[in-house]
Amino acid sequence: IPAFNGNTLLGLPQYIEGRVGVVFGTLYCAPKRLDKGKYPVRVYESPQEAHRCYRENLDAYHRLTDDHPDEFRLLLNRTDLSSHLSQWDAFINNSREAAPPVGIVVLMEGAEGVREPAEVEQWYEWGVRLIGPAWAGNRYCGGTREPGPLSKEGIELLERMADLGMVLDISHMDHQSARQSLDLYQGQVIASHSNAETLIQDIPINRHLQDETIHQLIERDGVMGIVPLNAFLDWHWRDHGGREAMSLDHVIAQIDHVCQLAGNTRHVALGTDFDGGFGVESVPSEIDTIADLQKIEPRLSEKGYNEEDITHIFSENWLRILENNLPAS
């Protein structure tokens, strides 16, 4: 929707060209109080409306994969994932193989669609494998632009998620509730699409992770997906030369910062948010489509990262999370 988002970075040919075999497919609806006509998405005013909206999102993924099984596939368990990766390996190693589908693991961004914590089990049965409790603040916890701790309901939500073996996503959670979650949650924790706050000069919102939180995430063997969005790399990018002044060096700096904090490459990956309401006009100048993420590899090599390091960052870290936390079958 160019009038809102700019020109898209995504398309099936670009997924294939960029060797993007697995993505987190996001369920998302906006709270009406924050919309103001800005976002071309469904909005809600109550938990019941949020539930309906998120369920419609999920149904859309099921229709997509049912109607186009050669192009998109839901990955619900380790058996699905293993079979899917084997197909991708065959394709990468033999160009004569037909292009495989893109695998989708469903992630709920903002838990307002969960009307009460006990309902998590129903969403799990429907195919949701990861939940980020916040987008903005809600009855479960503080979120972006709306700070606050975990509520009693939020703690119960985390307990229900842990019982099911779900992955907790702390992206968009407030600093306080994210750190609480890292202390309390008994399952796997990630930050699917967050950057290091310390590298974003003068950022006025609580959207990204402080180094203290990144250290906690590393201690919990979590993974943090770096977002190549200009405003999340330089808050004042429009004043500093616009898109043409933004380069992949900003992305590399974010990746390297997490690696330096960790002392290794096991805790950082890519979390593009390219389905998140922005287009090519808002990303570094070397990126025209998602396929251009491959340009990050030689830049990492130039900085001294070896082949194993780069494999961790591009695929193995996220795959470790999925292989360790998806149900067996």
What role is predicted for each listed range?
Residues 177-218:
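Aromatic-anchored, glycine/proline-accented short structural segments
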Residues 1-134, 138-152, 199, 206-329:
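N-terminal hydrophobic targeting/anchoring segments and the immediately downstream early-domain regions
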Residues 147-184, 188-193:
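Loop-centered beta-sheet repeat module
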